[in-house]
Amino acid sequence: MTYIKGNTGKWEYVIGLEIHAQISSKSKLFSGSSTTFAAMPNSQVSYVDAAMPGMLPVLNKHCVHQAIKTGLALKAQINKYSVFDRKNYFYADLPQGYQISQFYYPIVQNGTMKILTSTGDLKTIRINRLHLEQDAGKSIHDQSPHYSFIDLNRAGIGLMEIVTEPDISSPEEAAEFVKKLRSLLRYIGSCDGDMEKGSMRCDANISVRRSGEPLGIRCEIKNINSIRNIIKAIEFEAKRQVDLIESGGIVIQETRLFNADSGETRTIRLKEEAIDYRYFPDPDLLPLIISDELINKLKANLPELPDQKIEKYMKEFGLSKYDAEVIVADESVAEYFEQAANECNPKMLTNWLTSELFGQLNKASIGISKCKITPSNFAKLIKLIENDTISGKIAKTVFEIMFETGKAPDKIVEEKGLVQVSDNNVLNTVIDEVITENPKSVEDYRSGKEKLFSFFVGQIMKKTGGKANPILVNQLLKEKLGS
């Protein structure tokens, strides 16, 4: 359990999340308008999106299927009967004057997702519901000192709002949940999870309490746009509430906004209750009826999910749970790994993948899909190390050339003359030279200064251009020095 340290003792975090995930679909939830990101403002707006009189919404079947698949992946109940409601409020980028959502009868309920806690234990986070709704447009305030502008390209794009129970007990758990959910959505293809583009947004409901006490008054932090900011926003808001209570104040139920630059939250408005939105069934849309046949068909076509892959990697490839989770977190990395792991030692591959390759990808700010090294060539590099053709040190040089050029490792080794020296006669000759050239060091070593052993190894590596087999060098050198 993670606690907040106050002046009067420890306080507990109580956190629930609302994730707004834009559905991966070529058209909007209730119209045929395109959903292409960053198009010219107001170029993807139909009469339905603009709320022109007499225009009726038509439900996008693909969006419904995406929601069902997501619900199945979350081990949730798919409701065969659900209803679209009007959520009434006025805002400039909501031309209808209401948002079409699902309040009373959502499409998905009662799901779960397990996350790994800081102690290494698995914790189940309950998911209250997943419902379908349409996104609002976008208000732009920084283009003019006198006017605000409205872009309706986003208006009507399908959203899945995924709401957890208040089961999350630390900022790190919240971040872990969002990371795992994002990975899951990407695997099934229902959302690309790009928080920078706003296709996945997070609201956090936060309250604090003493251990064993009832739930406190919560505040909602809106539109947190990165994993890092989830942690920062929750930490700040929880500490703000603790300081307020300890100084004799009262937490007001309100909606707040996190400022990433200052690291603080500020009040936007008092928190609304459901009654304020005057929900009622949308008269333009029939209830959504889902058949068992459709649910079973979508379930049968689900891809292998992250938790299933983790179990497979541990069982088939002998990976640790941690390594398996690191690889599985990104579907494209998992696909790359599987292609290479069938041709080489998977454990050694994992070490190189998570250290050398990830390091170079981060340095170049690219994803694995843009990597010039093919899975097959990566496997060849691992095999060259395994069969002692090259040393680990030389392999790093070869890897860097591969990353820049995409060349096969065996070609690079051949062109650069980097084959590891593993011939006993050749190595003994070099060792004899080093011993002859350093009589004082030999005498000191034999007198008990064993740290000099690494000096001799370094001299041998220098003479062989780093190509000497290090294991063989250690063995032969010890024999020569009589140790």
From Swiss-Prot:
It comes from the Bacteria. It catalyses: L-glutamyl-tRNA(Gln) + L-glutamine + ATP + H2O = L-glutaminyl-tRNA(Gln) + L-glutamate + ADP + phosphate + H(+); L-aspartyl-tRNA(Asn) + L-glutamine + ATP + H2O = L-asparaginyl-tRNA(Asn) + L-glutamate + ADP + phosphate + 2 H(+). Pfam families: GatB_N, GatB_Yqey. GO terms for molecular function: asparaginyl-tRNA synthase (glutamine-hydrolyzing) activity; ATP binding; glutaminyl-tRNA synthase (glutamine-hydrolyzing) activity. It is an enzyme of class 6 (ligase). One of its GO terms (biological process) is glutaminyl-tRNAGln biosynthesis via transamidation. InterPro entries: Asn/Gln-tRNA_amidoTrfase_suB/E (IPR017959), Asn/Gln-tRNA_Trfase_suB/E_cat (IPR006075), Asn/Gln_amidotransferase (IPR018027), Asn/Gln_tRNA_amidoTrase-B-like (IPR003789), GatB (IPR004413), GatB_C_1 (IPR042114), GatB_Yqey_C_2 (IPR023168), Gln-tRNA_amidoTrfase_suB_CS (IPR017958). Disulfide bonds: none annotated. Keywords: ATP-binding, Ligase, Nucleotide-binding, Protein biosynthesis. One of its GO terms (cellular component) is glutamyl-tRNA(Gln) amidotransferase complex. Its EC number is 6.3.5.-. Heterotrimer of A, B and C subunits. Belongs to the GatB/GatE family. GatB subfamily. Allows the formation of correctly charged Asn-tRNA(Asn) or Gln-tRNA(Gln) through the transamidation of misacylated Asp-tRNA(Asn) or Glu-tRNA(Gln) in organisms which lack either or both of asparaginyl-tRNA or glutaminyl-tRNA synthetases. The reaction takes place in the presence of glutamine and ATP through an activated phospho-Asp-tRNA(Asn) or phospho-Glu-tRNA(Gln). NCBIfam families: gatB, PRK05477.1-2, PRK05477.1-4, PRK05477.1-5. This is Aspartyl/glutamyl-tRNA(Asn/Gln) amidotransferase subunit B. It comes from Rickettsia canadensis (strain McKiel). The gene is gatB.
